[in-house]
Amino acid sequence: MDLKNHFLVAMPSMNDPVFTRSVIYICEHDSDGTMGLRINQPVQISLKGMLDQIKLDNPSPIIFPQTLSQPVLNGGPVSDDRGFVLHYPKDNYSSSIEVTEELSVTTSKDILATLGTEDQPYKYLVALGYSGWDAGQLEQELSENTWLILEADSSVIFDTPIPDRWRRAIEILGISPVNISSEVGHA
């Protein structure tokens, strides 16, 4: 099963403090492993604060300052000093990976210079770090009933308030978090 462009949603019973109530957007899944971005855990810095710290030269005027007030997200515990921008494709950035026809992940600074300007992607989120699994590791966690899987919905990523994304992802499955059991049954 290819999990690219799916959500991993932490089961309510997950006791790993790193991933409790996490929603992870899977960007890559193949025989070598899995890479995704957690989309529902902000860090204590805004996008403007992060951009001020890295001192990018921005030749275009800031015309959408409100977009720079959004929080940066904690994408996961791996390489948490690296930035990842999940966005609707626009232009050609130096280091982008197309996840779907609609979504790309970019890791180069050239996209950061567009944020807040007329050249910014239509919709985007910025995360520091990513969530990663070695070959077979995620499949093992799935067999242990650690995660729920569902096809990704861009409205959860870009239009749902951050604190509501976990609950919303579960609701898309048609279930309530209180009705989920961590026990695996056998018929």
Curated annotation (Swiss-Prot):
Which stretches are annotated as coiled coil? none
The record, for Gene3D superfamilies, names: VC0467-like (3.40.1740.10), VC0467-like domains (3.30.70.1300)
**Organism superkingdom:** Bacteria
Q: Name a single GO cellular component.
A: cytosol
Q: Name one Pfam family in it.
A: DUF179
Q: Which family does it belong to?
A: Belongs to the UPF0301 (AlgH) family.
The protein's name is: UPF0301 protein VSAL_I0547
Organism (species): Aliivibrio salmonicida (strain LFI1238) (Vibrio salmonicida (strain LFI1238))
